[in-house]
UniProtKB/Swiss-Prot annotation:
One of its GO terms (biological process) is heat acclimation. It comes from Arabidopsis thaliana. Residues 994-1008, 1046-1057 have a biased composition (Polar residues). This is Lysine-specific demethylase REF6. Zn(2+) 2 binds at C1268, C1273, H1286, H1290. It is found in: Nucleus. The gene is REF6.
Length: 1360
């Protein structure tokens, strides 16, 4: 334990670390602890921690020690009675055990920030430990050459220096159930004697024995006694005894009181920075060797010690405070905190829960379930008990309790108002989902006495506890079938607690075990109802169910779901990777909004006694409504191996259900209540109900426009006698429990493939809860149209089904379970995340990704968008937030703390939905007629990342076909200057289709290649970049099609479009904007108009009649079309300079007249006052109504790819008004861009195979010398080919694609693609040749790291 004798100056970062706030309540405010904490929570939570200085003195030292010894003695006696062991010293005083904690740095450890903790094996009385602690402190300071009295900052400096010095150990007695405060009965008596205020802190409501269940704390309604949560724990420490970075269980508040001794330093990080904090720990603490989920679990072991300096440098808000004896420290939900003691001291702590905790309770429960930790509490149970208790209160006019202060009542009313609002919102959400899922059928109520149904067993709890074999601190499970789970005290968790004690809210409990403080939670209604329900106790005594998707304990309503036979067969045999994409794209939040959009008037009732079928959409149908026709084909089942690697591949599936498919499936019934069945199994389409009547139901009814669940249509059972027929494959028909929200999501996913069997269950007191919610809603003036829900009692068959579902929870299914196939099994994903396969990246699960702040791999871009031009040197700085008393700017904080652009996220999701291909059951994608597969997958994804796209666009309709009058001569194709004139041709049939890379036709001699952004026309010599992927390389199935509906649809210049409104919207947004301005700026000379029909089909007539809104939208979309080539990564060509010269000549002739007339023309065009002849209209990608008043002469127009230039700020403006000023500004920007293009094209590389050009001769010379001319790079290459490939480093070009079916990953380099393919194939080619090792590795980096760390031989490397 060598200690450096150098000067112990305070670290600068410690001096600058913000100090957490301290609050000094008045005596009146101090009477209601929860109300006061709720009052300061908004301010203090931005620090994560705060300090409260009581207005009353602490208890005397003698009293505190006496109470502590009494608690320790009682605990020892209880252990002796339970057959354990108790320890007392020879004088008869109680003793306690301690743990050894490492101080110092051990570089040999894999992760040095994880400090070892182990049992010391010593037993001390309070006096003995105090003597040893003070002796250690004296000796340590003497070796440091420091005086005995040090400031807090000096001690902190000593501590952090010791953490990086030679290791030594200290002792700490923590997590000991007990309290040093006087018993509650004695405290109440003394309070009465003193007039209700108390003489010391222990005689007030701040007595730690009662804080968890204080008035206003939600934990008041927990029936279990969990040490450290609902009852306090004691901590006895010595100098440098530390507690590691952690958050409280379920993100609860914690209250900590220091009784006596030296001070204690606390460090805190606010909840807003929690995810960023975890990422810094993962990167800087764990060396990026753990994925985020395992990082969170490892932090939960409470062994990670890291200096706040690391977090401050990484942009994480962090603060500190020093707790002195007699002071309280409050930590707020989700705030990470750690600290250490300055010397010998002892204190105690427990959890509380203010109403603000309810806002984050669900997310905390999901994160806890994601690491397979069993839940300790149901936030919904506490919420319901809390609100119903408020309803049964005695009116204040006859309340014998004195009103202490208006502040107390005001703070309490704020908390009550918040809980009531959350309560009503939750019941409304349930009401909508019950109505949409149940279709009006009675919902089963769980029995009041459910001893015959074992809802939770010890096996289930034990299987959820995690054991970490690497650490001496671990959770031990003696026997999965035993009655208790033994928890090693060294793990920093709670004491040895029986499962039935700790999780009694999950299991059946005695109905007579009620605390007197909770008696008012039982009734809120009349005395008659109270007598009627005298057998039932508070709502907390009812059993709880855990959702398989999110892990949250559903206290009120659950759904038991089983896929139907058809859906199960599909799930077991087909590649279902697109389900994950569907979930990632839609999100669960949309379902609630969708449910609220439903109309309850169309609901029909089902059979009341059995599971009922959900109306499904079969795949064999062809429905025609009016002039609208939609059709789909029956899927072909494709077989695929169901293994872990297949699941990994499914995480990268690139197809999802698009809006187009949803709209096609939306069918209007011919008459109210009358629908037609299209049976997938080949039946006559009718199902017979129990009463013998024939009931038709609509198989086509899909979602509403918001993807909601339809309430219309009838459904009845075919298999009434046995609704769940046993199948040979248990995994395919396994019953699972879902919360209502995720049950609705699963129903929506499986609806097209056969549907589900569904049983809805509610708490036996749910009708009473819903009745109370309606009263509270009126009180809060919340208007809602409640759906009427009928309830029924469960039958014996229902109880057997419930028991089977709960048994399936305990039986851990493999990767063939249908919920695993569907990607909605949270427990399986949590287990999978701990496998070596996912050591650095979590397996995709939408719930887990959202809980840990990760974006969906479907929507996330593989590389960051490049900001080029002059804007790259200037980073816009803005205020991100205020934490720890400081305003944080965007350049100061960790990237995880930067606010996400909600509009950008929505547009990205919309873009993903529109770009994603439709996929049938065979795994093949069906492409729109005018979009090639390659262009959509590559360009669409890139375009989504760089531009915000409107969710809706102007429908594009097929116009009259045109015939080329004057072709392009050979001369014009050389200088790329041409003139085209078109005339209407209604008598000539023309072909618009061609297989391959080019598309041409008699009427369309120019076509935009969506993949490359190059104009293809007759006589035009095509060229392409070396970095681009050819369509032919991906197979002959990829075709480029023009967007004509049919050849015969052109006749007579008028037609009915074969596209409905929504199809055209999709086609527009899927079009790559690849047409240069020279072809888009045409004068329309042949008058055409669109007339909207009620059925959504547009008809053409002979006069322009277009609304201002449509015109403005078209002009805005033209802005997007102009800049597409800028964003495609397509920069230089071999003939850049020639085209630039021609463009400059043309510009001098036309720019002035265009400026004078463009604004006036657009205004007249938008108002419908002016008709112009059509010069051309091409149905290729990105064609828009762009008007030029004066047509330039022959030779003035040209096609020229745009340069990757600066991004104009108006790129995302699709709906702004096109005024004269806007048009003039656009012309000025065009001139600036052309100047840059000319500069860029001034110096062309003439080396063979190189098409790059530069703006200066210096850059060109460096380039020819095989030196990268990019500023700050300057790399040298021995081959010009490698230099050209190196340019990918400085651009967004990712030409290489993963060949695995369903994977959307793209790469810049071949080696990275090769390594990625191993993820799909499971290949592990690197094998350690060391005897008795034989480890295999997928990546060479992992293999090299293994050899460095182990020293194994590198000479015998094998590849297999």
């Amino acid at each position: 334990m060598a200690v450096s004798e150098q000067s112990q100056d305070v670290f600068p970062w410690l001096k600058s670390l913000p100090v957490a706030p301290e609050f000094r309540p008045t005596l009146a405010e101090f009477q209601d602890p929860i109300a006061y904490i709720l009052k300061i929570e908004e301010e203090a939570s931005r620090y994560g921690i705060c300090k409260i200085l009581p207005p009353l003195p602490p208890p005397s030292k003698k009293t505190s020690i006496s109470n502590l010894n009494r608690s320790l003695a009682a605990r020892a006696a209880a252990r002796v009675r339970d057959g354990g062991f108790g320890a007392c010293d020879y004088d008869g005083g109680p003793t306690f055990a301690t743990r050894q904690q490492q101080i110092g740095f051990c570089p040999r450890k894999q992760r040095p920030v994880q400090r070892p903790v182990w049992q010391s094996g010593e037993e001390y009385s309070f006096g003995e430990f105090e003597f040893k602690a003070k002796n250690f402190e004296k000796n340590y300071l003497k070796k440091c050459g420091k005086k005995s009295q040090l400031s807090a900052l000096e001690i902190e400096t000593l501590y952090w220096r010791a953490t990086v010095d030679k290791p030594f150990s200290v002792e700490y007695a923590n997590d000991m159930p007990g309290s040093a405060f006087i018993p509650l009965s004695l405290a109440a008596a003394r309070r009465r004697e003193s007039g209700g205020e108390g003489g010391t802190v222990g005689e007030t409501a701040w007595n730690m024995r009662a804080m968890s269940r204080a008035e206003g704390s939600l934990l008041k309604f927990m029936k279990e006694e969990i040490p450290g949560v609902t009852s306090p724990m004691v901590y006895v420490a010595m100098m440098f005894s530390w507690f590691a970075w952690h958050v409280e269980d379920h993100d609860l508040h914690s209250l900590n009181y220091l009784h006596m001794g030296a001070g204690k330093t606390w460090y805190g990080v606010p909840k807003d920075a929690a995810l960023a904090f975890e990422e810094v720990v993962r990167v800087h603490g764990y060396g990026e060797e753990l994925n985020p989920l395992v990082t969170f679990s490892t932090l939960g072991e409470k062994t990670t010690v890291m200096s706040p300096e690391v977090f401050v440098k990484a942009g994480i808000p962090c603060c500190r405070l020093v707790q002195n004896p007699g002071e309280f420290v409050v930590t707020f939900p989700g705030a990470y905190h750690s600290g250490f003691s300055h010397g010998f001291n002892f204190g105690e702590a427990s959890n509380i829960a203010t109403p603000e905790w309810l806002r984050m309770a669900k997310d905390a429960a999901i994160r806890r379930a994601a690491i397979n930790y069993p839940p300790m509490v149901s936030h919904l149970q506490l919420l319901y008990d809390f609100v119903l208790a408020l309803g049964s209160r005695v009116p204040t006019s006859i309340n014998p309790k004195p009103r202490s202060s208006r502040l107390k009542d005001k703070a309490r009313s704020e908390g009550e108002r918040l809980t009531k609002k959350l309560f009503v919102q939750n019941i409304i959400h349930n009401n909508e989902l019950l109505s949409s899922l149940g279709k009006g059928s009675p919902v089963a109520l769980l029995p009041q006495s459910s001893s015959d149904i074992s809802v939770c067993s010890d096996l289930r709890i034990g299987s959820h506890l995690i054991t970490n074999q690497e650490n001496p601190i671990q959770l031990k499970c003696e026997d999965l079938s035993s009655d208790s789970v033994v928890v090693d005290l060294s793990n920093g968790l709670k004491d040895t607690v029986s499962v039935k004690e700790k999780f009694t809210s999950l299991c059946e409990r005695s109905r007579n075990h009620l605390a007197s403080t909770e008696k008012d939670t039982q009734e809120t209604l009349s005395d008659a109802e109270r007598r009627k329900n005298d057998a039932a106790v508070a709502l907390s005594d009812q059993r709880l169910f855990s959702c398989v998707t999110c892990g949250v304990l559903s206290f009120d309503c659950v759904a038991i779901v089983q896929p139907k036979e058809a859906a199960a067969r599909y799930l077991m045999s087909a590649d279902c990777s697109f389900f994950n994409d569907w979930t990632a794209a839609s999100g669960s939040a949309n379902l609630g909004q969708a449910a609220r959009s439903l109309h309850p008037q169309s609901k029909e009732k089902h059979d009341v006694n059995y599971f009922y079928n959900v109306p499904v959409q079969t795949m064999d149908h062809s429905v025609k409504t009016g002039d609208q026709k939609t059709s789909t084909t029956s899927p072909t089942i494709a077989h695929k191996d169901n293994d872990v690697l297949g699941m990994l591949a499914s995480a990268y599936g690139d197809s999802s259900d698009s809006e187009e498919e949803d709209q096609k499936g939306l069918v209007t019934p011919s008459s109210k209540g009358e629908t037609k069945t299209y049976d997938q199994e080949g039946s006559d389409g009718h199902e017979e109900a129990r009463d013998g009547r024939t009931s038709d139901f609509n198989c086509q009814r899909l979602t509403s426009e918001q993807n909601g669940l339809s309430k219309g249509g009838k459904s009845s059972l075919l298999e009434i006698a046995l609704p769940f027929i046993p199948r040979s494959d248990d995994d395919s028909c396994r019953l699972h429990v879902f919360c209502l929200e995720h049950a609705a999501e699963v129903e929506q996913q499986l609806r097209p493939f056969g549907g589900i069997n569904l049983m809805l269950l509610c708490h036996p007191e749910y009708p009473r809860i819903e009745a109370e919610a309606k009263i509270v809603a009126e009180e809060l003036v919340i208007n809602h149209e409640w759906n009427d829900t009928e309830f029924r009692n469960v039958t014996r068959e229902d109880e057997e089904t419930i028991q089977a579902a709960l048994d399936n929870v305990e039986a851990k299914g493999g990767n063939s379970d249908w919920t695993v196939k569907l990607g909605v099994n949270l427990s399986y994903s949590a287990i999978l995340s701990r496998s070596p396969l996912y050591s650095k990246q979590m397996p995709y699960n939408s719930i887990i990704y959202k809980a840990f702040g990760r974006s969906s791999p479907v929507a996330s871009s593989p590389s960051k968008p490049k900001v080029s031009g002059k804007r790259s040197s200037r980073q816009r700085k803005y205020v991100v937030g205020k934490w720890c008393g400081k305003v944080w700017m965007s350049h100061q904080v960790h990237p995880f703390l930067l606010e996400q652009d909600l509009e950008g996220e929505e547009s990205e999701r919309s873009c993903h939905l529109r770009v994603a291909m439709d996929e049938d059951a065979t795994g093949k994608r069906s492409f729109p007629n005018n979009v090639s597969r390659d262009s959509t997958t590559m360009f669409g994804r890139k375009y989504c990342r760089k531009r915000k796209i409107r969710a809706k666009a102007v429908p594009r309709k097929k116009l009259t076909s045109f015939k080329r009058e004057d072709g392009v001569s050979d001369d014009t194709s050389e200088d790329h200057s041409y003139k085209q004139q078109w005339r209407a041709s209604g008598n000539e049939e023309e072909s618009y289709f061609e297989t391959g890379n080019t598309a041409s036709g008699d009427s369309s001699n120019q076509m935009s290649d969506p993949h490359k952004g190059i104009i293809r026309h007759k006589g035009y010599k095509e060229f392409e970049s070396d970095d681009e992927v050819s369509d032919r390389s991906l197979g002959e199935e990829y075709t480029v099609r023009a967007c004509a509906a049919s050849e015969s649809s052109m006749e007579n210049g008028s037609q009915h479009s074969m596209y409905d409104h929504d199809d055209d919207d999709d086609d527009i947004d899927r079009q790559p904007r690849g047409i240069p301005r020279s072809q888009q700026t045409r004068v329309f000379r042949n008058p055409v108009s669109y007339e909207s029909e009620d059925n959504g089909v547009y008809q053409q007539s002979g006069r322009i009649s277009i609304s201002n809104r449509q015109a403005n939208r078209m002009v805005g979309e033209y802005d997007s079309a102009e800049n597409s080539l800028e964003e495609r990564g397509f920069c230089s060509t071999g003939k850049r300079q020639t085209r630039s010269t021609a463009k400059r000549i043309a510009k001098t002739k036309t720019v002035q007249s265009s400026r004078d007339t463009k604004g006036r023309f657009l205004q007249e065009f938008a108002s419908g006052k002016k008709n112009e002849e059509l010069d051309s209209y091409m149905e290729g990608p990105s064609t828009r109504l762009r008007v030029r008043h004066q047509k330039p002469s022959r030779g003035s127009l040209e096609t020229k790819p745009k340069k990757i230039g600066k991004k104009r700020s108006g790129n995302a403006s699709f709906s702004r008004v096109a005024t004269e000023k806007d048009v003039e500004e656009k012309e000025e920007e065009e001139e600036e861009e052309e100047n840059e293009e000319e500069e860029c094209a001034a110096y062309q590389c003439n080396m063979e195979g190189c098409t790059m050009s530069f703006s200066s001769e210096k850059q060109l010379m460096l380039h020819k010398r095989n030196i990268c001319p990019i500023k700050g790079c300057g790399k040298n290459f021995f081959s010009h080919k490698y230099l050209v490939q190196h340019q990918r480093v400085h651009s967004d070009d990712r030409p290489l694609k993963c060949p695995w079916k369903g994977c959307k990953m793209t790469f810049k380099w071949a080696w990275s693609r090769t390594e990625h393919i191993r993820v799909h194939t499971g290949a592990r080619p690197y094998v350690c040749a060391e005897p008795d090792c034989g480890q295999t590795f997928r990546f060479v980096s992992d293999f090299s790291r293994h050899k460095r760390k182990t020293g194994h031989s590198v000479k015998k490397t094998n590849k297999r």
